């Protein structure tokens, strides 16, 4: 990066922003993922069906994530991203508290909707900030650190959610505070109120970076961001690469969210574990395997050059799909919680690798004023299709075809293997399109151009 860019953000300051955004992402996953460990008590206290639980954990969340993501993407490309992120964290924290005050399906649905819409800003805003404050060679590592926060938060949701649920179910809990609430409602209140911490840290310790183009880091970006229809046209009409790539990422996240949403219930129903025991198994596995996968992808990226980073990432994602197919096909045959958790850990680990690299091609190839909207489109697509279809289809399939019994493992395997197969085909398509376009392009038109190589080596 140029001296001018280096002067704006010193190494320590940039590292703090990356770490803090990772912490914020951890809080977002804590708020959204705690539902998975509270599924059984919520199901019983509110008399919900598996389909309704699938709607809460999947379809409804993803729809409002998508609806909130597009206008927030417009704001990311035009406004102060630090303040916008802080405002969204405050909103989803309040919504989490309201989830704890819900007494029926509709109230919980509305609270989840606000949580989803507000969380849609975090990843696009964070990655957009990183692209404007870091050298290109540091962006994949920063993205990996950001995604690690999600695994820490998701694992904390499972472990702390189960622990808090046990605590608030005990006589030692402070039942004088809102005594009419059930234990699972108290868990939501505690987690929601904790959101004040990252809001304060963002507003008091960070500043907004100037916007810069990746391919010309000395050039300030002042032109207006294009409307969303032009961004869609660029991604899905003018380029043949982005459509199968983004849809492939969405398909592989159908796998992850299917497993993530229902695995605690699977352990509880299949092996008669308590919520606390399931959280004790899954929380550490989520953190350890997720971080290992995320960091492992960085070892892969360190071997790449500016000329091959995009196609090699696509190949990596295709290989991950094959691993998921083999791994999750074995889930129905797990004979103990330990074996099941190993399958879960592998699924989470390879997802960690996906999360760390999936948006790097977009960061490196899309123009600055389209970057926030493009990453938001991709991330909203992941949540609309991944979060929306995965949990819903598992719950629907289990309830309608198997009567809602202890067949969740079979349902998760069926949805996961099918989705991973589709993702493999889509990544193969995007790889061949990208390779063909590179061969046909003039040297100055290649996406990963010499200008980008110069910025990476600086």
What are these regions (language model features)?
Residues 3-11, 209-244, 270, 450:
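Juxtamembrane intracellular "pre-TM" segments in multi-pass secondary transporters
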């Amino acid at each position: 990066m140029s001296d001018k860019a280096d002067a704006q953000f010193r190494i320590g300051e940039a590292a703090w922003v990356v770490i803090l955004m990772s912490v914020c992402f951890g809080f977002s996953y804590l708020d959204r993922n705690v539902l998975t460990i509270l599924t059984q008590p919520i199901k019983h206290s509110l008399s919900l069906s598996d389909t309704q639980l699938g709607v809460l954990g999947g379809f409804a969340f993803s729809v409002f994530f998508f609806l909130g993501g597009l206008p927030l993407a417009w704001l990311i490309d035009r406004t102060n991203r630090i303040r916008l992120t802080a405002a969204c964290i405050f909103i989803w924290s309040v919504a989490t508290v309201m989830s704890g005050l819900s007494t029926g399906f509709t109230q919980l649905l509305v609270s989840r909707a606000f949580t989803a819409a507000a969380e849609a800003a975090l990843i696009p805003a964070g990655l957009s900030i990183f692209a404007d404050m870091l050298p290109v060679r540091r962006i994949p590592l920063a993205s990996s650190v950001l995604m690690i926060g999600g695994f820490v938060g998701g694992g904390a949701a499972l472990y702390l959610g189960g622990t808090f649920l046990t605590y608030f179910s005990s006589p030692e809990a402070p039942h004088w505070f809102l005594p009419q609430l059930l234990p699972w409602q108290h868990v939501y209140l505690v987690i929601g109120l904790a959101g004040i911490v990252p809001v304060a840290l963002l507003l008091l310790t960070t500043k907004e970076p100037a916007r810069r183009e990746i391919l010309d880091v000395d050039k300030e970006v002042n032109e207006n961001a294009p409307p969303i229809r032009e961004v869609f046209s660029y991604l899905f009409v003018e380029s043949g690469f982005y459509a199968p790539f983004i849809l492939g990422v969405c398909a592989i996240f159908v796998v992850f969210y299917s497993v993530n949403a229902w695995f605690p219930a699977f352990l509880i129903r299949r092996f008669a574990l308590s919520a606390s025991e399931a959280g004790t198994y899954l929380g550490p596995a989520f953190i350890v395997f997720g971080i290992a996968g995320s960091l492992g992808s960085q070892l892969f990226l360190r071997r790449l050059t500016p000329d091959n980073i995009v196609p090699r990432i696509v190949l990596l994602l295709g290989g991950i799909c094959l691993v998921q197919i083999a791994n999750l096909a074995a889930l129905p045959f797990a004979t103990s919680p330990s074996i099941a958790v190993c399958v879960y850990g592998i699924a989470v680990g390879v997802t960690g690798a996906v999360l760390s690299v999936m948006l790097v091609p977009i960061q490196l190839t899309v123009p600055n004023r389209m970057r926030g909207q493009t990453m938001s489109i991709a991330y909203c697509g992941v949540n609309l299709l991944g979060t929306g279809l995965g949990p819903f289809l598992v719950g629907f399939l289990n309830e309608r075809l198997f009567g809602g019994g202890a067949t969740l493992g079979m349902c998760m395997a069926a949805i996961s293997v099918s989705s991973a197969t589709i993702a493999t085909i889509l990544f193969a398509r995007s790889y061949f399109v990208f390779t063909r376009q590179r061969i046909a392009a003039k040297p100055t038109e290649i996406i990963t151009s010499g200008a980008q190589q110069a910025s990476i080596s600086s």
